Every structure is written in structure tokens, then in C-alpha cells.
């Protein structure tokens, strides 16, 4: 979208805060249904960020695949769980929780220090030059197809395998 600067900045801050609070809701809500709905909200915010960056095809794919299918699949799987499976040990803090917290905190601070130490001026100009050259040659849909079949072939296949395993797991839970 070609919006004026202040409106674009406001929408970025609004969607960023929506992402932040939604992701906190995914982690902190005790009820898995609320966590799944919060995940859906986060994925919608990501799709709106794609729309702000003029990637309408990626935004539509984000809405259809992740919000429309994955979130519904997660809610479907959570609906089959018994209440006692997720509410009995909420207040216990294990060693694994502590190790995970330390690892996640370390990753967070390393990302923050990397972001603060990066010279964004050079990155922005390099990105703009590459976008101009690629946009002159082919469209966005063709770029996505080329990148999925060349640069991102392995992650694309891994995601399809993960989705297949999730679907098989949902079917096995539904049969029990």
C-alpha cells in the first residue's frame, strides 16, 4: 500500500504491538483454545504486515494456509483434548522450563544486540537496488515460485512434511 509516512508508521507500530501482545497471549493463556485464537490473531497481523509491504499474494497465502487451515487444525486438535490433560500441572516449574527460559532469553538478547549493531543504512539501499532489478524482470508471483523451487526447496519440503505429520496426528486423535 502506498500510504503517507505517518499513517504507514502508525500502522506498523499498531500491527507490531498486536503481534507482541498476541504472541504473549499464545504463551501465557492457560486455556489452549484462547491460545489458539491468539495465534490466529498473530497470523492475521503478519498477513496485514505483508499487505503493508505490497506483497498481496503472500498475504493471501498467509491467510488461507495459516489462519484458515493451521489455526483451525490446532483448534480441532485442542477440542479433542480432555481438560485434565492440560490443567493438572500448571503451577509446577521443572528444570526443563528453566533451561528453556535461559536459552530463549539468550537468543532474545543476542538478537537484540545483533539488531542494534547492524548498519541498517547499507542494508536498506542494497535491498532497494535488488528489488528494483528483480521487479523490472519478473512479477512477484514468479519471484515466489522461483525462490520456492530453488533457494527454499528444502524448507518448503520440510514444512510439507510437518503439515502431513500434523494432519495424521489430528486424524489419529479424532479416531480415539
Swiss-Prot record:
Keyword tags: Chloroplast, Membrane, NAD, NADP, Plastid, Plastoquinone, Quinone, Thylakoid, Translocase, Transmembrane, Transmembrane helix, Transport
Major localization class: plastid
Keyword Transport listed: yes
Membrane-crossing residue ranges in chain numbering: 10-30, 32-52, 61-81, 95-115, 152-172
Coiled-coil features, chain-numbered ranges: none
Keyword Ligase recorded: no
One Gene Ontology term, aspect cellular component: chloroplast thylakoid membrane
EC number: 7.1.1.-
Record InterPro entries: NAD(P)H-Q_Oxidoreduct_6, NADH_UbQ/plastoQ_OxRdtase_su6, Nuo/plastoQ_OxRdtase_6_NuoJ
Catalytic activity: a plastoquinone + NADH + (n+1) H(+)(in) = a plastoquinol + NAD(+) + n H(+)(out); a plastoquinone + NADPH + (n+1) H(+)(in) = a plastoquinol + NADP(+) + n H(+)(out)
Localization in the cell: Plastid, Chloroplast thylakoid membrane
Its membrane topology: Multi-pass membrane protein
GO molecular function: NADH dehydrogenase (ubiquinone) activity; quinone binding
Enzyme class, broadest EC rank: translocase
Superkingdom classification of source: Eukaryota
PANTHER family: NAD(P)H-QUINONE OXIDOREDUCTASE SUBUNIT 6, CHLOROPLASTIC
Family as reported in the entry's similarity comment: Belongs to the complex I subunit 6 family.
Function: NDH shuttles electrons from NAD(P)H:plastoquinone, via FMN and iron-sulfur (Fe-S) centers, to quinones in the photosynthetic chain and possibly in a chloroplast respiratory chain. The immediate electron acceptor for the enzyme in this species is believed to be plastoquinone. Couples the redox reaction to proton translocation, and thus conserves the redox energy in a proton gradient.
Assembly description: NDH is composed of at least 16 different subunits, 5 of which are encoded in the nucleus.
Record's protein name: NAD(P)H-quinone oxidoreductase subunit 6, chloroplastic
Lineage: Eukaryota, Viridiplantae, Streptophyta, Embryophyta, Tracheophyta
Amino acid at each position: 500500500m502506498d500510504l503517507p509516512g505517518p499513517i504507514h508508521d502508525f500502522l506498523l507500530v499498531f500491527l507490531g504491538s498486536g503481534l507482541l501482545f498476541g504472541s504473549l497471549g499464545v504463551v501465557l493463556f492457560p486455556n489452549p483454545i484462547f491460545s489458539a485464537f491468539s495465534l490466529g490473531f498473530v497470523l492475521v497481523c503478519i498477513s496485514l504486515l505483508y499487505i503493508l509491504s505490497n506483497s498481496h499474494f503472500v498475504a493471501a497465502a498467509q491467510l488461507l494456509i495459516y489462519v484458515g487451515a493451521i489455526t483451525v487444525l490446532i483448534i480441532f486438535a485442542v477440542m479433542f483434548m480432555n481438560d485434565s490433560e492440560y490443567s493438572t500441572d500448571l503451577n509446577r516449574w521443572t528444570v526443563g522450563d528453566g533451561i528453556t527460559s535461559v536459552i530463549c532469553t539468550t537468543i532474545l538478547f543476542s538478537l537484540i544486540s545483533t539488531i542494534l549493531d547492524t548498519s541498517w543504512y547499507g542494508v536498506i539501499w542494497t535491498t532497494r537496488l535488488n528489488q528494483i532489478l528483480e521487479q523490472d524482470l519478473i512479477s512477484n508471483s514468479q519471484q515466489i515460485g522461483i525462490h520456492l523451487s530453488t533457494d527454499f526447496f528444502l524448507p518448503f519440503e520440510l514444512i510439507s512434511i510437518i503439515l502431513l505429520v500434523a494432519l495424521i496426528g489430528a486424524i489419529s486423535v479424532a479416531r480415539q
